Amino acid sequence: MDLTGVRMDLVQAALGRIAFDALILNVQVVNVYSGLVEPGNIGIKHGRIVTCQAPKDAPAETVWDGQGRFALPGLIDTHVHIDSTLLTPAGLAEFMVPHGTIAVFAD
């Protein structure tokens, strides 16, 4: 599928017109702009979050229960010295990603 087709799918899924690839129900969505934490359901299409307010009964290939866990954007560590960790970049990623850090600026 070309980029235009993917974009159209993302929009159509966000509008509830086509099924999600995955749906995560019952999460607490952290809005980092307002500071509010609100219940939500996350709809995913082509590996991208397209909505945090999907209906519970929305069609999806895969459905998970988030069991009230928190959903928030990934963190970016803007200052890390990989050499002082005594890990390879891949080893550091194996440790950091499960804890929410998705990117680093390293020297």
What are the functions of these language-model segments?
Residues 2-25, 29-73:
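Histidine-rich, glycine-flanked metal-binding segment
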